[in-house]
Amino acid sequence: MCSVRPAHAVIDLDALRHNYRFARRLGGGKALAVVKADAYGHGAVRCAQALEAEVDGFAVACIEEALELRQAGIQAPILLLEGFFEVEELELIAKHNLWTVIASSWQVRALAAFHSPSPIGVWLKLDSGMHRLGLEPKEFRDAWMSLHSLPQVGEVVLMTHLARADELDNPRTNEQASVFAHASQGMVAPASVCNSSGLLGWAGLYSDWGRPGLMLYGVNPISQESTSLSGPLRPVMMVYSKLIAVRELPAGEPVGYGASFVTERPTRVGVVAMGYADGYPYFAVNGTPLLVDGRVCPLIGRVSMDMLTVDLTDHPQADVGSQVQLWGVQPGVAELAAHCNLSAYQLLCGLKRVRRYYLGEMGAV
């Protein structure tokens, strides 16, 4: 049997389903499972297959991601969060029964000129203050009325996106909610306001549809982590590797590139088969926690392309072959991100060269 490099990720699909149920229960309505960017690095097809029996729908960034799911046999509704970029995409949207965000007047006109064999579900997006995609408030009502008059348009959902909902003491979220409420006043249509931060931190903004993304994967995006609602979330991704070498160094010896760490005492140094080419953050600082055979040990030295080093001095039982957890339950991905001045989104989406295993299955994707 061929040996393989030990760096790998384990994806807990039961935890994924648990988190989706929690998000839907929390919002009190329906919930789109956001599986864009390959399900935040977890594997979009396999995650969608795990959720399809109970999901209200999926959300992806673009049509390429939607077609990947359709080609894998996913039949549940799929929303294109960025809408369509070219008029020609409407043929594929209709053919594959996709929903699309409408975020500009030209898209309304394009849809009006398109003859669809069946009605297309539309999510009409208001720019309430994020200032990325979305119609201006003064355009919103006219767009809604135009879409309602078109036979090629099915149900229209009104939506907006919160920019600072991860900051619980910031007034911007309530300001955006007020803009959305004013712009949609009198429109009889389902609404969608809350992303993960909105669901976890802003109960007063719950509406017909939630859009859980990061929380699906067990991470609370709220920066203060002051909400008690993060407790029920279960981490979905656990990233592991092994010690491939152990060295004994005297005091005063530099470790790794640039000598960013110098031993202050006789030190056992473990070498782990995981580096920034795998997706472990290059900017992880000395002291960043790792779990070696279930015991917390600090990162020492600069992370290199294929390896990193850990202080095993206080863990004499650890040796070559010992299991190392880079993130998962402890440390959590949010904790690791904080040590690196990064976001959990970046870490999850940045895994490379790492095999994925799904609990209950032996095959890597």
From Swiss-Prot:
Keyword set includes Aminoacyl-tRNA synthetase: no
Protein's gene: alr
Name of the featured protein: Alanine racemase
Binding annotation for substrate: R132, M305
GO cellular component: cytosol
Role noted for this protein: Catalyzes the interconversion of L-alanine and D-alanine. May also act on other amino acids.
Stored Gene3D superfamilies: Alanine racemase, Lyase, Ornithine Decarboxylase, Chain A, domain 1
Active site: K36 (proton acceptor), Y257 (proton acceptor)
